[in-house]
């Protein structure tokens, strides 16, 4: 069966594994998901990610990050632009997640960027998700 929204599936797997205090979470690999994982690692929300071969295709494995007393580094994840309702933001009207404490992940003409990076480059795009 085909998946209509692979990004939402990735974020749901991440949210569920984080809530259950799992150390890792695996999902089918795609370039878009790998780029989202790179952003999450660069922003400090996950410890690491890896691409592993599977019987069919590849698997993307995320290593989740927890604090000293098993505090979650990800408080919440929300999918914004969906296949049925795309959400776009201009460079002059980029979203701020919790006053700058979280990040918005945007798909721009310059690739996937956070809201801060898109603001510096002066580009807008499709708002994929919020992470805080």
Swiss-Prot record:
It holds the Pfam family Ribosomal_S8. It comes from the Bacteria. GO terms for cellular component: ribonucleoprotein complex; ribosome. Keywords: Ribonucleoprotein, Ribosomal protein, RNA-binding, rRNA-binding. The keyword Metal-binding does not apply. InterPro entries: Ribosomal_uS8, Ribosomal_uS8_sf. The keyword RNA-binding applies. One of its GO terms (molecular function) is rRNA binding. One of its GO terms (biological process) is translation. Belongs to the universal ribosomal protein uS8 family. One of the primary rRNA binding proteins, it binds directly to 16S rRNA central domain where it helps coordinate assembly of the platform of the 30S subunit. Part of the 30S ribosomal subunit. Contacts proteins S5 and S12. This is Small ribosomal subunit protein uS8. It comes from Kocuria rhizophila (strain ATCC 9341 / DSM 348 / NBRC 103217 / DC2201). The lineage of its organism: Bacteria, Bacillati, Actinomycetota, Actinomycetes, Micrococcales.
């Amino acid at each position: 069966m085909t998946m209509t929204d692979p990004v939402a599936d990735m974020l749901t797997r991440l949210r569920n594994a984080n809530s259950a205090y799992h150390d890792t979470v695996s999902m089918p690999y795609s370039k878009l998901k790998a780029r989202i994982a790179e952003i999450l690692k660069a922003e400090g929300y996950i410890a690491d990610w890896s691409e592993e071969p599977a019987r069919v295709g590849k698997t993307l494995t995320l290593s989740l990050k927890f604090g000293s007393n098993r505090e979650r580094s990800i408080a919440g994840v929300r999918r914004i632009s969906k296949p049925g309702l795309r959400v776009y933001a201009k460079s002059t009207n980029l979203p701020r997640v919790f006053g700058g404490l979280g990040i918005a992940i945007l798909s721009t003409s310059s690739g996937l960027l956070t809201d801060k990076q898109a603001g510096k480059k002066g580009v807008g795009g499709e708002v994929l998700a919020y992470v805080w």
